[in-house]
Amino acid sequence: MNLLNEFRKQNRQELVLSVNNKILNCTKCDNEFCHKCYRGSINAKVLIINDNATNDEDIIKYYNDLIDMSELNNNDILQVFAVSCVTTRKDKDSVIQRLPSKKECGNCKQYLNEIIDAVKPKIIISLGATALNQFIPGSNLLEYINTKQVFNGIPTLINYSVKDLFNLCSYKTDDEIDEISSSILATFNEAAQYLRLEGDNS
């Protein structure tokens, strides 16, 4: 049995690394900046699909802080992006980040499917509209917040992304922002509870 488990682990690692290499060498889009497709454990039981990749350090730090505050075990998490590129546009003399186009989303969908097939997580956490629309095209994120859906046959929890949270700061009250932060944290904890109920945290 141990030999079989080692074989499965090695095969999973090879598959995930293969997808990662495809993303790093992808030329489907003209985007200059790309991130690795994953961060975390290849033996993950929880796959977290974030919005498109970002290089905003404040967003990255706040997201990591929420993960650290949650009941999730870092050894159980694999984190990927719905779109692996940092999508940008020029605004006068500066370059700012933008939402990915439908074409860019479509180009990355194959990589998401391959990661899910390779890792076979017990549960998925989908954060943000971009992640949701990769699996339920044309959907309105607000209608799916705090719901459970099924992506590629796997139970999936839906919520805002941390990037959404930062964008909402300009027209939401502090109390509303705190409520959304708590909601995202609750989603992480719900995934941890799901694993406990499934007996997969041993």
Question: Where are the regions that the model predicts?
Answer:
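A polyanion-binding, active-site-adjacent surface
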Residues: 2-202
